[in-house]
């Protein structure tokens, strides 16, 4: 209970709210953790505190920790493990902590799907499922769905007198295909599976259309739409009231005030009717009559004010007219007839969905596979049982889990869906006031609605729970942000206090939701947040919508390139926490965030032109890559050589090497028939002399093709790909092209994709090609293989979704003028979790169709949910910045947009009016109106404070707001004055004078000689191993260098190499084991086997490497005198990296350069131990000794000493430089024979 919570220790770094989240218990707890508030650290600390609690310690395997991703789960385990190891240092004798470390790998810290899998594996016998099931591939799943659905529809078409089915087909299919019907069935199936009881949800959907005996007031759609009617009437009234204020100005059209007041009265009557019933509004709408505006002499009044008054009145009339046309042009009973007419058709549709679900589940069961939704529903099936009234109650298994788990902790709770919520509910206590559920998340960062995440679950508890936890659950707000500067936080708060509210946005951005400063930064220059609004040029706007989009991307890319280059070149400084100091910004400090990636290729191209290194993980382009395209055509030809286009592509490719003339020659031998038939015929005849080379190329390819076709019928697809790569030499060929490594990586991915395909229930080349086509149809192009590390010094481009959880010193958020994606609202049918199904009413006999009440309601609901989701996406984007936030958007007509945005200045409340926020079509429609109410926009607007309250106008935030002329970004670089004369002479094709001021400069540059030419023959950076080799006579000779040059640079992929580990790979594996041996545990076979298995799980070793480890040799080392010294040492450091400067003449025996030259030397010391009398350096060796030297180790010892003397001397020199302490002993340990060699100077 509350009074038993531990007090926060003195000097603790935890805030009061963080500490409360760490120690609070005794009820369900919801932690609303704002961006950068340290929620993961809090979660880990809470777990640790529970594990090491002195009075009531909890075993780690009695906690269920649910994370959003596998990576998050692994990070959580690692953090807990590190924290426990720190505890163990203070309490080395604690058996409880040691036990927790051993339990950690088996602990239930995982994604919800992994937990579901664990439950299913344990209780599979309660389900009709093969215990050896596998997880289905997404594309395989899609192909199976198609197969099942085709069979069902085929059966339905074959049934006589299937009247309702054919009615359904007539309404929802075109003359060409029934694709729309198939999409409806699949969409309803998918949506239903997002609910704990799919059949119940489908039945409710049908029940909603059974309106027998009901009035329109009984329909949920009408109730919801009435709220929207009130909203739109309120908007219209605000327009009229604003017009009235303007008309009453000294130079306003005062005679029109009387008419405007009558308008307000009319709108008031309509609003009153909307508060009563649908029928009341319908009747009131039939009597709407607007008075005619009084005529005035316009010259007597301010013309602009008159125009504004007229414009506002017209906007109000348009709002009412829209309502009349959409909702109240038909009698209420006609809407009811629509539902009644559609009811049997919808009933048939739902029946088909149920049949499909049943058949699809059966097919997956037969193939021994499940998908991710199956995992959730199977788990729920095990954990629940249905009562007589259809309610789901916890099963006996659920009670077992309730007894097992002391607490259930859920990370990223805002992204939970209904099914997952039910699973969690069944393994936790029933009562919130005495519950054991701990939830962490930030509903403002819930951006996965498209994955069926339900932020309403979080919001419901946040509203229901109290900060004291009295009578129910407790909520805790973590609002302090430890990531960002004040300027970023204040700028974000200023925008969201104005745009995010409960009616529009689903969340109140109140004092509890505001971001509060928790990080400390040194004073910085130019840290103000920025809004840069680019005005497109007239030429760009005229270019059409698609052309304008291209230009927008180019304009924004150029502006960002200029800013990045300027910041890097000027030495703009950012704070480095590791060194606790400011440092010059690097390219890796920048990120460009986009809502989606279509602009990314253009932005990358523009940045590259400016010499800026850039990377974007594009999910497209893989199948467009030339090498992949050619190989896919090869496989198409193997499958069916009668396809002319793929065959011609292969013949024209480097594999065969024909040119256009060769193809024309081949076609001339047979104008009819396929290319393959012509080629076969050509090869049967005797070629002309000039066709001999063509004949040889085609014969070579034809013979290979026949072999591949035969091979494809008998062997696996992956083996076929291997064979094609090898026999054509194409893999090696692309390796020699520009970006060869990338191209080879793409071909390896194709091989891997084939192996993945073969792990599915499908087989054969034809199905594989269909498999790939299905991927492309879905728009799931994979993106080219990754050939860049995370730590590369590049500017990154990513989606806002990908950036969630990350942070960057400088953030550009671009594309803010792009319209929101509302395509889902335009579909022929709409689905919603609460409102079910909505589509147009279609009468195929009368050939009419019109909007239905359900469609209007769902569309409106989805629009408001989309607006709320986009607000949360913007919040995520703005909170990624640590030090500098730059917002960029492009508009067609800045003056016109500014006029619209300036409406916001007339409002005195913090939260902008609903109609402004709900009417936004892009992010700029929220950002600009907000900033136009701040003093920092005055340099742009020059309008003064006006009626804006001081607390808004003078809010403590710094912004730079600027409109950028697109012409300045597209203008070419200005030509230097001194070059102008030469350029003009060249344009006019005149002779350029031979004598020039630049003649000597040009001559000097052409004849310039590098002052350190001797040094160019040597590397500026060497590893210790390379220096050692230079000192060995054979390695240092010219012949050895030539041998190295002859070694192939491009390596073959793993699957094309000989099996087995190389000596180097074996050595690497042994060194890895020696690095990770736990010196605190007894060195036994069992302990080492467990450790090696753990290294395999953590991907520190491969299975093959693990099998090669000779455990007895590792034990032999620790049994030796040297090994015992390691175990007894004061301190032991392993795998110690170092870098030092070394005189070049020490590294190179044949150095010819200047004596003062130095090079950079890098190396890694295997082991160093500190004993009472000094430091000993140990280097482990896996050289083969036994059987290689006839005289045994005595013969080998001087050779080995000579081989490794330089290496260990350099290691010792590096240690002595860094530690300022002499190395007393340098030892080589050889595992082969358990030999120790001491290296003397």
Curated annotation (Swiss-Prot):
Its cofactor is Mg(2+). This is ATP-dependent helicase/nuclease subunit A. One of its GO terms (biological process) is double-strand break repair via homologous recombination. InterPro entries: AddA, DNA_helicase_UvrD-like_C, DNA_helicase_UvrD/REP, P-loop_NTPase, PDDEXK-like_dom_sf, PDDEXK_AddAB-type, Restrct_endonuc-II-like, UvrD-like_ATP-bd. It comes from the Bacteria. Residues 505-805 form the UvrD-like helicase C-terminal domain. Heterodimer of AddA and AddB/RexB. GO terms for molecular function: 3'-5' DNA helicase activity; 3'-5' exonuclease activity; ATP binding; ATP hydrolysis activity; double-stranded DNA binding. It catalyses: Couples ATP hydrolysis with the unwinding of duplex DNA by translocating in the 3'-5' direction; ATP + H2O = ADP + phosphate + H(+). Belongs to the helicase family. AddA subfamily. The keyword Ribonucleoprotein does not apply. The heterodimer acts as both an ATP-dependent DNA helicase and an ATP-dependent, dual-direction single-stranded exonuclease. Recognizes the chi site generating a DNA molecule suitable for the initiation of homologous recombination. The AddA nuclease domain is required for chi fragment generation; this subunit has the helicase and 3' -> 5' nuclease activities. SUPFAM superfamilies: P-loop containing nucleoside triphosphate hydrolases (SSF52540), Restriction endonuclease-like (SSF52980). ATP binds at residues 33-40. Keywords: ATP-binding, DNA damage, DNA repair, DNA-binding, Exonuclease, Helicase, Hydrolase, Isomerase, Nuclease, Nucleotide-binding. Residues 12-485 form the UvrD-like helicase ATP-binding domain. It comes from Bacillus cereus (strain G9842). GO terms for cellular component: cytosol; DNA helicase complex. The keyword DNA repair applies. PROSITE patterns: UVRD_HELICASE_ATP_BIND, UVRD_HELICASE_CTER. Its EC number is 3.1.-.-, 5.6.2.4. The lineage of its organism: Bacteria, Bacillati, Bacillota, Bacilli, Bacillales.
